[in-house]
Every structure is written in structure tokens, then in C-alpha cells.
């Protein structure tokens, strides 16, 4: 099979020919470079109009020259309009800049009609994921997409790519560009930040993680202020990378923990950054997870990934009629019907428990519901031990939770975060309990070693026992916390324990607040974890709202809609 791919969502006018016979991809690209500032949509669209015919022509010339090497192609007749052996035309249908997408759509329709072959509409962000899966050979990885206008975590479950976490304001590349424009550097800003960061030292900047979501607006404002106040640009660039990429690596680890998978791929143009790659690789090594990064030519915007995914969709019968091929600037990856993966393994596999082997100290995996052994989450190792094994005389089974130092993070930043979160967990766990929410008793806290001893509660994580009754109760509990001015910060299905009661645990990201926005964000984090991993999330999402409104302020539910609309391309 041979596929002509066409890309042009923002800045790269690109065409490619993918031949599945030898798994070869030929790419021709012509990037748009603004004279000043960032990308100007009208100018970018004009560039697409001028550059796309040339890159398409170059790719078709290559296809014609190599058509004899292709097998099972549409035709090898040199007198045919399709003397290039092309079986279909795949194009970026969205998301992206509307003027650019419309130009690409027009070019793709014209090419499909001229070649007399079917048309395939491809989601640009899913293509970033699929090229990573294609090159790595992974079965069902989590994908961290870090690109100009986007930053999110995706995983496959029941016929869709679910959004596990995402930016709540701007894409990571655009965030870096905003800073570099502020100090007078030309587009693109990311490579310039990376170069300057080699000589920098750490300064304090905001670090914002909420569940598996994150925000860049605060850190960008702080970075601009630091530049205006005369802070060394090298130090700001270094600190931007340490904080932003630390946030992305942390949420990627949280996604691995939530789903139980042990495979991670990186996508998007910002993924070319060596520091980000190093952080993710270190994190995966510490977890025993596999990590893969596609070739650089597949990380930046390119038509090769469009052609590769187009081939999968074409083989699955996912073509689109010319009349139905309208582009969509807000095309979310979780809207795509993933027919080419029907019946394949879900990313949600359940979290295992490590147990020491008496023979050699190696680890084996038990079911997540087993209450004995050592369980590793995103931040900590948790040992469930008998009272006699504790350093203190305790009345019941004990949980020893030790927050691990993260080698991927800057040591100073890591020390600050682990200490603050250990203290916050101890304080908020007790305060939530005082507000009437079932939480473990805290028996001891040691900030220096980042270790807590807590009461063991429940029989399993909510993730293993999802029911509407349990989720309704979680809604009740969050409302009770909010009524007391407390925010959980990370109420995912892994941070709720169920048994004779429903318990909230792991308050490390918690804080005090009287703001309705923070309460709505708590609900969003819970709902997102349900939507990402449940087979039938709709009744569970309703249960969250029902449980919350029975106890809490209905204005929080109203604000929730606003919060969820902030996700990219909602």
C-alpha cells in the first residue's frame, strides 16, 4: 500500500509518501517562518497555498521514480493519472489553524480527485501518537504529546483515545514562544530556550500540577516578570525547562500509575528537546517502564505521520467522502473512532503490587487488590505492614508511605516538592477527617525522610470497584471537604479506597481554598479519571454531580462546565 500524506495545520507545509512494503516514508517539508513575532494565521495560510503544490509535486515525483519497487499498489500503468501507485490521500483534518487547514483540505481533495483514489481524514494529534506506537512496536502505550498548541496525555480504551490529562490553558510550545517573544527572540522559541538553558541555574517559579492536568500561564507570567526585573535570561530559561518539563514528566508518571501500563511514547515538536527526553527516560527507568521517542523528523509537524496513520485508517475502511471532508480546527483526539485498533488491548490494565522474592530480592507482581506487599504509585512506595513491623506501637494494620526522590527533577526542586507534599498530606488528611470525610488516621509524619505512617483503610482502589454508589459517595465527600475550605488536589480513582466505607486518601496535592474554581477543578480531576478509564463513564459522571449537589454548592457544578471547556479544543 502507498499513501500520499498532506500536512499543514500551522507552520509546516509538508507532503509524504508512505509505502508499507518496506515501511518507508519519504517526506518533503517547507516550514513557514514569520518575519517577526509568532505565527500569523493569514500569512501561514498564504505560505501553505504557495508551498503545498511544490512539496506534493516533489513527493509524487519520488513516488513515480520508485513505483516499480512498490507492491500491491493501485496501479503501475504509466498512462494512468495515478502512475505513482498511490492508494489513498490522507490529510490533516484538524486540529489546527482554520485558514491553514482549509488550504490543506482543498489540496487533499484536489489530489484525491486527480489520482482517482479515496480520501482519509486524519487527526493531527492522534497521528503524533500513532507514529510513536508504530516506530516503537509498543502494544498500548500512554502518549505524552508536547507540541506547540497542545500538551496532553492519551491512552487507548474501548475504541477511543482517552484524554488522561492536558493543559488547561496553552500548549507547551506556545508557552515558551510567549516568553521568548517577550524578550525579543524570534520564532520558534523552544530551541533558543534549550540553548540558553545550558548555562543557567535554578530560580523559583510556579509549579502547577492538578491531578494529571497542568497549567503554564502562571509560570509564563512569572518568567516574564523575572526578565523585566533583570534576572539572568540563562537562569530563567534553565528554570523554565526544569519546572515545565518536570511537570510534564510528573503527569506522565501519574498516567502510567493510573492505567497500570508500562509503555510511554513521546510526540510533538517540543519532544525534540533533549532535557525533556532525558527526564522521561530517567523516570521510566526508575519505574521499570519502556520509553521510546520517534525520529526527530516525526516529532515536528510532518506529513509522514499523517501518511502512516492514513494507511491504518484506509485498511480499516475509514475513508471520507469529498462532501464530508470539512476540516475541524477544534478536532479533539478523543472524538476519533479508532477502528484500526478494534479488539486491541486497553491502556488501562490495573496497577500491580511488588513483592520481594525470598530467593533473590527480585520483584513479582500481584493483583492490585492484594493488600499485602509493596505497591508503587506515581510518587511513593507504599508498604502495608503489621503493627509489630512498625517503629511505633500501633493499634491496627499500618501503611508506611515513602515519597521517593525523583532523579529526573532538579535536586532542589525535588526536595521542596517532596517535603511540601508530605506535610500537606498529613495535615489535609487529618483536617478532612475532622470535616466528616472518611480518611486514614495519621500516626506519624517525617518530613526529612518524606515518610508517613497511616491507618490501612479499604479493600481495593475505586479503580478496581467502580460503581455508581461509590462514585456518588466520593461526590458527597468532596462537597464536605469544600464546605470546610479544603481541596483534595488529586481525587482520581487511585486515590479513593472502597470496602465497608468509601475513603479518600493521598492528599499530597491538597491545599486550603475558598475559591469555587479550585472546587470545580477537584471535580474535573475525578471526572477525567473516570472518563479516561471506565468502560461506560456516562452514569459515573452523572453520579459525581448527583453526589456533590446533595451536599455541596450547585454553583460549583456550574463552574465545572467552564473549567472543562478550557481543555484544548473543547
PLM features: residue spans?
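A short helix-loop
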Residues: 5-8, 144-146, 153-231, 317-329, ...
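ATP-binding glycine-rich loop module of kinase domains
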Residues: 369-423
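A contiguous, well-structured pocket-lining segment that forms one wall/lid of small-molecule binding clefts
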Residues: 24, 68-81, 195-264, 275-285, ...
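N-terminal beta-alpha supersecondary unit
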Residues: 2-95, 102
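C-lobe/activation-segment region of protein kinase-like
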Residues: 507-570
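Conserved phosphate-binding/catalytic loops in two-lobed NTP-binding clefts
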Residues: 122, 281-306, 319-323
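Conserved structural core of kinase catalytic domains
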Residues: 418-422, 437-474
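Conserved phosphate-binding catalytic cores of ATP/NTP-utilizing and phosphoryl-transfer enzymes
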Residues: 117-142
Amino acid at each position: 500500500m502507498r499513501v500520499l500524506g498532506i500536512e499543514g495545520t500551522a507552520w509546516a507545509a509538508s507532503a509524504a509518501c508512505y509505502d508499507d512494503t518496506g515501511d518507508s516514508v519519504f517526506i518533503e517539508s517547507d516550514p513557514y517562518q514569520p518575519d517577526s513575532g509568532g505565527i500569523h494565521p493569514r500569512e501561514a495560510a498564504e505560505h501553505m497555498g504557495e508551498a503545498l503544490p511544490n512539496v506534493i509535486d516533489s513527493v509524487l515525483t519520488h513516488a513515480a521514480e520508485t513505483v516499480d519497487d512498490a507492491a500491491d499498489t493501485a496501479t503501475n500503468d504509466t498512462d494512468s493519472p495515478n502512475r505513482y501507485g498511490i492508494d489513498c490521500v490522507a490529510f490533516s483534518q484538524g486540529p489546527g489553524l482554520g485558514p491553514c487547514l482549509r488550504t490543506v483540505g482543498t489540496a487533499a481533495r484536489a489530489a484525491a480527485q486527480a489520482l482517482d483514489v479515496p480520501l482519509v481524514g486524519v487527526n493531527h494529534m492522534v497521528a503524533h501518537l500513532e507514529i510513536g506506537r508504530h516506530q516503537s512496536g509498543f502494544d498500548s502505550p500512554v502518549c505524552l504529546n508536547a507540541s506547540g498548541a497542545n500538551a496532553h496525555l492519551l491512552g487507548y480504551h474501548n475504541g477511543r483515545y482517552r484524554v488522561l490529562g492536558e493543559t488547561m490553558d496553552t500548549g507547551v510550545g506556545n508557552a515558551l514562544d510567549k516568553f521568548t517573544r517577550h524578550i525579543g527572540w524570534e520564532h520558534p522559541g523552544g530551541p533558543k530556550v534549550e540553548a540558553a538553558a545550558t548555562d543557567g541555574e535554578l530560580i523559583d517559579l510556579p509549579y502547577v500540577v492538578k491531578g494529571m492536568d497542568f497549567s503554564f500561564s502562571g509560570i509564563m507570567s512569572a518568567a516574564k516578570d523575572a526578565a523585566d526585573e533583570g534576572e539572568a535570561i540563562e537562569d530563567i530559561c534553565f528554570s523554565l525547562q526544569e519546572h515545565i518539563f518536570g511537570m510534564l514528566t510528573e503527569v506522565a508518571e501519574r498516567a502510567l500509575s493510573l492505567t497500570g501500563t508500562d509503555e510511554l511514547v513521546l510526540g510533538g515538536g517540543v519532544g525534540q528537546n533533549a532535557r525533556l527526553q532525558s527526564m522521561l527516560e530517567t523516570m521510566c527507568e526508575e519505574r521499570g517502564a519502556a520509553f521510546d521517542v520517534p525520529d526527530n523528523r516525526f516529532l515536528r509537524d510532518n506529513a509522514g505521520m499523517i501518511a502512516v496513520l492514513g494507511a491504518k485508517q484506509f485498511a480499516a475502511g475509514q475513508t471520507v467522502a469529498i462532501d464530508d471532508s470539512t476540516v475541524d480546527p477544534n478536532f479533539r483526539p478523543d472524538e476519533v473512532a479508532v477502528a484500526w485498533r478494534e479488539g486491541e488491548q486497553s491502556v488501562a490494565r490495573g496497577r500491580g503490587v511488588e513483592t520481594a522474592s525470598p530467593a533473590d530480592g527480585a520483584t513479582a507482581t500481584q493483583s492490585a487488590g492484594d493488600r499485602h506487599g509493596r505497591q508503587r504509585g506515581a510518587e511513593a512506595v507504599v508498604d502495608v505492614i503489621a503493627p509489630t513491623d512498625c517503629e511505633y506501637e500501633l493499634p491496627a494494620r499500618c501503611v508506611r508511605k515513602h515519597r521517593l526522590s525523583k532523579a529526573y527533577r532538579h535536586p532542589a526542586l525535588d526536595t521542596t516538592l517532596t517535603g511540601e507534599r508530605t506535610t500537606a498530606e498529613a495535615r489535609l488528611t487529618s483536617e478532612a477527617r475532622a470535616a466528616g470525610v472518611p480518611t486514614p488516621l495519621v500516626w506519624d509524619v517525617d518530613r526529612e525522610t518524606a515518610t508517613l505512617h497511616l491507618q490501612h483503610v479499604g479493600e481495593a482502589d475505586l479503580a478496581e470497584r467502580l460503581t455508581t454508589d461509590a462514585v456518588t459517595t466520593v461526590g458527597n465527600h468532596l462537597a464536605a471537604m469544600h464546605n470546610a475550605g479544603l481541596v483534595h488536589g488529586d481525587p482520581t480513582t487511585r486515590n479513593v479506597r472502597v470496602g465497608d466505607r468509601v475513603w479518600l486518601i493521598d492528599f499530597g496535592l491538597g491545599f486550603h481554598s475558598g475559591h469555587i474554581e479550585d472546587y470545580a477543578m477537584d471535580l474535573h480531576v475525578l471526572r477525567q479519571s473516570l472518563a479516561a478509564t471506565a468502560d461506560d463513564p456516562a452514569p459515573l459522571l452523572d453520579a459525581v454531580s448527583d453526589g456533590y449537589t446533595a451536599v455541596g454548592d450547585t454553583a460549583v457544578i456550574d463552574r465545572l462546565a467552564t473549567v472543562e471547556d478550557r481543555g484544548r479544543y473543547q
